[in-house]
Amino acid sequence: MPELPEVETVRRTLCPRVVGRRIRRVEILTPRQIYHPDPATFAADLEGAVFDDIERRGKYLLFRLGPRILVAHLRMSGHLYVCGPEAPRPRHLHVVFHLDDGGELRYADQRKFGGFHLLGPGGEGMPPGLANLGPEPLSPEFTPQVLAERLAGRHTSIKAALLNQALVAGLGNIYADEALFCARIHPAREAGSLTPAEVERLHGCIRRVLLRAVERRGTTFSLYRDGEGNEGDMYDELQVFDRAGEPCPVCGTPIRKVAVAQRGTHFCPRCQPVPEGVALSPRRARPGRRGNSVRVAAEPPGTYE
């Protein structure tokens, strides 16, 4: 699933191609990808609208069109990109926004989990997930104190807490694992058990990991592409995610993959000791995107500078 760095990269690559453009027509090939309003109203209301700006909130893209906001959620495999009308149409193409310069803003989605909400002038139709998002981890408002307050008293694992979009917006499986490795905290640790020093270290690691991933334009395994159709470059810098069986870049201990918060979770059993009394369910390691090749830029925990 595209996480904050991938969605931010899509936003940055779409802005120069879309902002200022007028929608001539909306072609809806798969009506189920339109969540609000009904597809016919959706297409009619957007005809003639101009893209004023594109913003991001967590994993959501927000297209501002005058008093209206078009919300896009890519979920597992959604892909928003701009191309010319002559470009071949992919098999899983669902929505096409025809622009006044002849270009097309296309939405493709192999698994069909993503889609669109068109909000009314008063915010009508806002998806609950967007309305309940926690703080942006790269914003000034996200401080160690804010993170500590949101983790306090929570008995879930710290991995589950980081995946909870109502606590912190934008983190997913990849960067939760990377941030916890950077902070030397086991993913199964009880969230409320972290010490002030550990919370501060985790806060810094979340920000460093995300900033580096944004700089590297996100992580591509198979489906993710940016708004121009390009892959992200972060894969070879991942320290633990998708590295099961490979040596830890710090101590050489083989990286393990287990189930935490019902998600495949990667960690170093030496750098991130298993909490006492916690039983872990192993997960089968799959070959990495490049055949489980050795990573190019292994960095020890706490770096990502």
UniProtKB/Swiss-Prot annotation:
This is Formamidopyrimidine-DNA glycosylase. Belongs to the FPG family. Its cofactor is Zn(2+). PANTHER family: FORMAMIDOPYRIMIDINE-DNA GLYCOSYLASE (PTHR22993:SF9). NCBIfam families: fpg (TIGR00577), PRK01103.1 (NF002211). It catalyses: Hydrolysis of DNA containing ring-opened 7-methylguanine residues, releasing 2,6-diamino-4-hydroxy-5-(N-methyl)formamidopyrimidine; 2'-deoxyribonucleotide-(2'-deoxyribose 5'-phosphate)-2'-deoxyribonucleotide-DNA = a 3'-end 2'-deoxyribonucleotide-(2,3-dehydro-2,3-deoxyribose 5'-phosphate)-DNA + a 5'-end 5'-phospho-2'-deoxyribonucleoside-DNA + H(+). InterPro entries: DNA_glyclase/AP_lyase_DNA-bd, DNA_glyclase_Znf_dom_DNA_BS, Formamido-pyr_DNA_Glyclase, FPG_cat, MutM-like_N-ter, Ribosomal_uS13-like_H2TH, Znf_DNA_glyclase/AP_lyase, Znf_FPG/IleRS. Its EC number is 3.2.2.23, 4.2.99.18. The keyword Protein transport does not apply. Monomer. Binds 1 zinc ion per subunit. One of its GO terms (molecular function) is zinc ion binding. Keywords: DNA damage, DNA repair, DNA-binding, Glycosidase, Hydrolase, Lyase, Metal-binding, Multifunctional enzyme, Zinc, Zinc-finger. GO terms for biological process: base-excision repair. It holds the Pfam family Fapy_DNA_glyco. Residues 282-305 are annotated as: Disordered. DNA binds at H92, R111, R154. A zinc finger (FPG-type) spans 239-273. SMART domains: Fapy_DNA_glyco, H2TH. Involved in base excision repair of DNA damaged by oxidation or by mutagenic agents. Acts as a DNA glycosylase that recognizes and removes damaged bases. Has a preference for oxidized purines, such as 7,8-dihydro-8-oxoguanine (8-oxoG). Has AP (apurinic/apyrimidinic) lyase activity and introduces nicks in the DNA strand. Cleaves the DNA backbone by beta-delta elimination to generate a single-strand break at the site of the removed base with both 3'- and 5'-phosphates.
